[in-house]
From Swiss-Prot:
Organism: Cricetulus longicaudatus (Long-tailed dwarf hamster)
Stated name of the protein: Peroxisomal biogenesis factor 3
Organism classification: Eukaryota, Metazoa, Chordata, Craniata, Vertebrata
UniProt record similarity statement: Belongs to the peroxin-3 family.
UniProt key word Membrane: yes
General function of this protein: Involved in peroxisome biosynthesis and integrity. Assembles membrane vesicles before the matrix proteins are translocated. As a docking factor for PEX19, is necessary for the import of peroxisomal membrane proteins in the peroxisomes.
Main location class: membrane
Annotated TM spans: 16-36, 117-140
Entry GO CC: peroxisomal membrane; peroxisome
Length: 373
């Protein structure tokens, strides 16, 4: 039996070698294919897990953004009410002073200024925090993903995060003061000559707000005169000029300071981008629209108006003397800067443009390529 098999192999030696080679090749290719398929499956699973983890971190970061905005609104409201103290003027009016008309004129300017600044600063706060927290959120995600690997250093340690995020104080401090000055000048120019007895409809108010916005958004401080016109001039109220106090220290900068300066420069680049300008402008449009909606309930037609056949839906059907509009405008700050979720703030936080912009910022700063910069 063995001899006959051996003779068979000798007679068909080449065929057997060929067959063995083919079978061996098929076996090796099969094993190689299985290995590659397993590697691809493992890589896809790892990518899916990483993407799911990043998505979860992003969504968690957005909730943090929303809570941070709400937590900072009382500080913003207090700063505004301190700089534009209309309550002291209304208290004076209760005593019927001899200069009552002069006080009413001051109250007119301060009331409109306060509500308009409230809209601007709240919109800025929402979008600026979206930028800052998604930049730092991207760095934190990378830190969590790479910690302990190949001796990678932490990109954004807690002390850097704190130092970087403290830059929001510019908007609540010097930036807000400058914004108040610019808006007050614009209000004075548009409404200063309007008599307290002059009646205005909701449509008239909308037009006045548009005129004030044009003046405010065209204003550029000396340091912004040479800037590209495509860059929003409102950035000057959100971040200080190019040379930050840290960068001004030519010597003795710690690694923490250098990292913070890098983060601030990246933030400034983002604020000066066309996308940021578009998103902020969209927020402002929504904010002023909501402000008018809040005041619309005071412009409902009376029974007498209805009897005269005035159109209920017309924005110009009901007019009020400016003196009666002032208290309405004056009280809007409590709705605009409300730390409890209000329609005004919720509208801004839930806007799709804001969400998409936040996602783009996070995507840009949470990719591994960020480590190579």
């Amino acid at each position: 039996m063995l001899r006959s098999m051996w003779n068979f192999l000798k007679r068909h030696k080449k065929k057997c070698i060929f067959l063995g080679t083919v079978l061996g090749g098929v076996y090796i290719l099969g094993k190689y294919g299985q290995k590659k398929i397993r590697e691809i499956q493992e890589r896809e699973a790892a990518e899916y897990i990483a993407q799911a983890r990043r998505q979860y971190h992003f969504e968690s970061n957005q909730r943090t953004c929303n809570m941070t905005v709400l937590s900072m609104l009382p500080t913003l409201r207090e700063a505004l009410m301190q700089q534009l103290n209309s309550e002291s003027l209304t208290a004076l009016l209760k005593n019927r002073p001899s200069n009552k008309l002069e006080i009413w004129e001051d109250l007119k300017i301060i009331s409109f200024t306060r509500s308009i600044v409230a809209v601007y600063s709240t919109c800025m706060l929402v979008v600026l925090l979206r930028v800052q927290l998604n930049i730092i959120g991207g760095y934190i995600y990378l830190d969590n993903a790479t910690v302990g690997k190949n001796g990678t250093t932490v990109l954004a340690p807690p002390d850097v995060q704190q130092q970087y995020l403290s830059s929001i104080q510019h908007l609540l401090g010097d930036g807000l003061t400058e914004l108040v000055t610019v808006i007050k000048q614009a209000v004075q120019r548009i409404l200063g000559s309007v008599s307290l007895k002059h009646s205005l409809s909701l449509l008239d108010l909308e037009q006045k707000l548009k005129e004030i916005r044009i003046l405010v958004e065209q204003h550029r401080s000396p340091s912004w005169i040479d800037k590209d016109v495509s860059k929003s001039s409102l950035c000057q109220y959100m971040m200080p000029d190019e040379e930050t106090p840290l960068a001004a220290q030519a010597y003795g900068l710690s690694p923490r300071d250098i990292t913070t300066i890098k983060l601030l420069n990246e933030t400034r680049d983002m604020l000066e981008s066309p996308d940021f300008s578009t998103v902020l402008n969209t927020c402002l449009n929504r904010g002023f629209s909501r402000l008018l909606d809040n005041m619309a309930e005071f412009f409902r037609p009376t029974e007498q108006d209805l009897q005269h056949g005035n159109s209920i839906n017309s924005l110009s059907s009901v007019s009020l003397p400016l003196a009666k509009i002032i208290p309405i405008v004056n009280g809007q700050i409590h709705s605009v800067c409300s730390d409890t979720p209000s329609h005004f703030v919720q509208d801004l936080l839930m806007m799709e443009q804001v969400k998409d912009f936040a996602a783009n910022v996070y995507e840009a700063f949470s990719t591994p390529q960020q480590l190579e910069k």
